[in-house]
Amino acid sequence: MFSEKMLELGRHSSVIREIFEYSKKRKAEIGEDKVFDFSLGNPSIPTPDAFRQTLVDLIENSNPVDLHGYTSAVGDNTARQTIANNIKKRFGFDQSSDLIYMTCGAAASLTVTLKALLNEGDEVILLAPFFPEYKVFVENAGGVVKIADCNPETFQPDVDKIREQLSDRTRAIIINSPNNPTGAVFSRDNLLKIADLLSSQKHPVYILADEPYRTLAYDGVEVPYIPAIYKNTVVCTSYSKSLSIPGERIGYIAVSPECEGARDFFFAICGAGRSMGYVCAPSLFQKAAALCDTLPSDVSAYDRNRRLLYSSLSEIGYTCILPEGAFYLFVKSLEQDANAFSMMARKQELLLVPSDSFGVKGWVRIAYCTSYEQIEKSIPAFKKLYESYKVR
């Protein structure tokens, strides 16, 4: 009676969302301050004052019909040109505004781009661990997922593992750096090796650079701009994390002008958006986000949280990967079954995301985009959880 695939997706929410919904229920039962919810990557830093003021200025000083009316399907031309100019200023890369498509966030950017790129049975390589919805996006576009494990010690890409997954049906590889769930920032050296490998293929293999965490990096680590490294790159990004506006759903696709078939690729993106009912991204937020495109992200609060959580858990005895970016800590499960470990953590009111849905086993993800006070209060619970395994 209904689409079996869509019914199955609707009946079973993602693990992250399931934990988030459990959190709301549990907080209502025992009190919000007694539940340590580290499930959802929801920014805790307030939206910058400059962004809020930009919204006010636009509302007060713009023609309301123009401000709230339709833009072109590809986006507001001034916003697209502003973004292209800023890419040139920030990265020294000549991005044509005619190859920028405004979207409702990075998820929409990826779904549209995959729909534009894939024919039935085409393959997309995912670097494990990966954001779980990638698999949904690829399969919804008719693609087949191929998984290449990252280095288990550093979670940097393993070029040999990528090579093993390449075939004549490979159309793309999704690269997410800074990475969700590990917090790893992929090094320039590794990206150059991937670029060399992909360039050696007989047909174009595109990098889809998923970059919502680009501005969230610590200790001066470099986050290389991939289009400047590999010509067949499409950037899929959003302002959700950089401006702390995840609920506003605004982002863009930037097709590198150096891509093979760049113009036709962009036309296919336009066609994919049309086929999926995307009329245009929210007009007000297109304009506001573009005007605030270069606002620096204040990562000091996240950095403080990162240092506290990493040092505290390491001192207790947990094995952790020190994140270089984003706002996630990847922690080794105290038993091989991360789902079972996650359920044990619930007994201490710790809500952690098991790594199975990220494509690897034996880890949990902790989203530390929360208050410093909550992290401080959670440390005794992590200690009790650790000690409970010592006596088993």
Stretch-by-stretch model annotation:
Residues 85, 89, 163, 340-343, ...:
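PLP-dependent enzyme catalytic core of the Aspartate aminotransferase-like
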Residues 276-281, 309, 328-348, 367, ...:
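Accessory recognition modules or surfaces
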Residues 283-290, 302-314, 320-332, 358:
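Conserved glycine-rich beta-strand-loop-beta hairpin in the small C-terminal domain of fold type I
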